[in-house]
Every structure is written in structure tokens, then in C-alpha cells.
């Protein structure tokens, strides 16, 4: 099912709560707004947030001869989405599975979803380096995945976990497309001034240390946060904000025009 996909991008984070799913979702929307056919696969089995972020909660998936049919976001149906969140009754339902069952589900997501022809598939992964990540890497061995984007925050604790993520990528042979530093500063909703409320520059320093590109720095912007649950792209709703400019730059770095 992956052989018809031109580009496969993984989005990783060493720690939870760094905004990885938001970056994944907005990157997928940015690519779709650029005219590309895009798939977004959420394999965070225990904490699927993509359906909520795109305003797709309550949608059901069904099967065809080729496998599961993804849920489409937007009237133009340029963004196809698959998540375990579509298979759960509600957001409060917990996924309490052992490793083998998680592995089997991820393999199904990667092998049995009828994506059809896509320009890009963005894979939103769970935090850390667990069985789920190893399964993804094994399933992608037969295809030419572009590589991984690693999301971090400026705090030292998050950066420590990202160092492990960098090591994981190198050991499993997945290329690192770059590092994104998220939640670096707070944008005032009244005057748009960005104040450094945490430390900053950690993502840049880590990228230099790991000898990989630094793809950009994203602030905490309440206007961007308000888009959660709407399915709207930041690049169209807030075209001049820092987040939009960084997203466009990332899209360009992975070949999107």
C-alpha cells in the first residue's frame, strides 16, 4: 500500500507534550494547501490526537477490497487521515494492549490502508523509542522513506530525550531531515511581541551537535492554538505569523513547492 506514495515523512519526539502532533497536523495541512495529495497516519495508539486536531472526531472508517478507507479532511479531499481514534467509541476509551497487539495494529495501518496515490505521507508517532517505532522502521525498510523530523522544546530535559531519538534514528538507519524547536517563546495576542518565557536555542545547538539541519523555531501562539479542532491550516488562516513561515520553510525543505 506504500508503493504508490512518493514521499514518507516521520515526525518523532523524545518526550510527550512537545507539540509533535500539532506539528504533524499543520505540516500535512500545509502540504495539502500547496496542492499536494497528502496522507496523515496517526500511530500514537495510546494518545491519538489527530482526529481532534482536525475536527474529525466521530467519523468512522470502513473497509474495501484494498483495505481500510481513510477519513478525508476538507471539501477537496486532498488530506486523507487514519488513526486508531476513529476505531474507538470516544476519547475517554483507553487502549490497554500489550506489545504484540500494538505491533499488529501498526502493521495493519502501514500495510492495509487504501491510501491510493499520494505525494506525501506524514506519520505521527508516539513519543520515545518503543516497540511501535521499531515496527514502523521494519515496515519502511522496503520503501524509500525520506526520513524523520524531530520535534523538541527548549528545556534541557526534553533535549536529553531528543538526543536519544537522534541515536535511535542513526541506529535504525532512518535519515534525520532536521530538528524543530517548538514552544520557544510566547507571542502576545495583543501586540504580537514574542517573549522568551523558557530557555531558547536548544534546538539549534542540538542540530549543530548532531550535524543535522535546524528546520525552524516555533513560538507558543494562542492564535495557532485556537485552530485546534477546526481542521484549518495555519498557513491560510495566519499566513504572516512565525509558525506559518516556518511550516512553509519545512515544506520547501522536503520538496514541496
Curated annotation (Swiss-Prot):
Iron keyword on record = yes
* Keywords (A to Z) from UniProt: 4Fe-4S, ATP-binding, Cytoplasm, Iron, Iron-sulfur, Metal-binding, Nucleotide-binding
Q: Where in the cell is it found?
A: Cytoplasm
Task: Copy out the cofactor comment.
Answer: Binds 4 [4Fe-4S] clusters per heterotetramer. Contains two stable clusters in the N-termini of NUBP1 and two labile, bridging clusters between subunits of the NUBP1-NUBP2 heterotetramer.
Q: Which GO terms describe its biological process?
A: iron-sulfur cluster assembly
Binding, [4Fe-4S] cluster: 188, 191
Q: What is its main location?
A: cytoplasm
Q: Which residues bind ATP?
A: 14-21
Q: How does it assemble?
A: Heterotetramer of 2 NUBP1 and 2 NUBP2 chains.
Q: Which PANTHER family match?
A: CYTOSOLIC FE-S CLUSTER ASSEMBLY FACTOR NUBP2, NUCLEOTIDE-BINDING PROTEIN NBP35 YEAST -RELATED
Name of the protein in question? Cytosolic Fe-S cluster assembly factor NUBP2 homolog
Q: Which organism is it from?
A: Culex quinquefasciatus
